[in-house]
Amino acid sequence: EKGKEILGKI
């Protein structure tokens, strides 16, 4: 899911 990409960004 996109959530993992967001978490990887921070």
UniProtKB/Swiss-Prot annotation:
It is found in: Secreted. Keywords: Secreted, Toxin. GO terms for cellular component: extracellular region. Expressed by the venom gland. Coiled coil: none annotated. Its main location: secreted. It comes from Tityus obscurus. This is Toxin To56. One of its GO terms (molecular function) is toxin activity.
